[in-house]
């Protein structure tokens, strides 16, 4: 009888910087989610955290195609009766530009404990400056 061989965890994670300036939201989100899951590595395992850390800068300058700036809606609910809040892409981009990329990437990650763990490896900043210089991140060209 053969035993199931599980791959050894490669704990050396890399840090990548992605510039979101003038990038399309969906296309950059797929690159980010693939890096977070580790699909760009030969040691990818669907049920293990083999991904890397991702720093996204200039999230305030991400774009969407077509007329989605006015038509794409983001909904949230306070939990109270009548507490549904709806805002467009343009309104959310002026109020919280990081939230747009976070919501897009979170929808592409697996649901459950692994997805929540992978989501903590995503760092999004609206400007060109980030505080993760000590990790020596590599620039990732999209």
Swiss-Prot record:
It is found in: Plastid, Chloroplast. Keywords: Chloroplast, Plastid, Ribonucleoprotein, Ribosomal protein. It comes from the Eukaryota. GO terms for biological process: negative regulation of translation; translation. Transmembrane segments: none annotated. GO terms for molecular function: mRNA binding; structural constituent of ribosome. GO terms for cellular component: chloroplast; cytosolic large ribosomal subunit. Its main location: plastid. InterPro entries: Ribosomal_uL13 (IPR005822), Ribosomal_uL13_bac-type (IPR005823), Ribosomal_uL13_CS (IPR023563), Ribosomal_uL13_sf (IPR036899). Belongs to the universal ribosomal protein uL13 family. Part of the 50S ribosomal subunit. This is Large ribosomal subunit protein uL13c.
């Amino acid at each position: 009888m053969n035993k199931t061989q599980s791959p050894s965890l490669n704990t050396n994670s890399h840090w990548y910087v992605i510039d979101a300036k003038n990038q399309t939201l969906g296309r950059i989100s797929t690159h980010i989610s693939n890096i977070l899951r580790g699909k760009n590595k030969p040691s990818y395992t669907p049920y293990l955290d083999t991904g890397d850390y991702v720093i996204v800068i200039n999230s305030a300058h991400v774009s969407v195609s077509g007329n989605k700036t006015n038509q794409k809606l983001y909904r949230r609910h306070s939990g109270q009766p009548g507490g549904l809040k709806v805002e467009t892409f343009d309104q959310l981009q002026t109020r919280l530009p990081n939230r747009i990329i976070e919501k897009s990437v979170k929808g592409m990650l697996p649901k459950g404990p692994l997805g929540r763990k992978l989501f903590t490896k995503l760092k999004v900043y609206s400007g060109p400056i980030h505080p993760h210089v000590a990790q020596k991140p590599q620039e990732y060209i999209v």
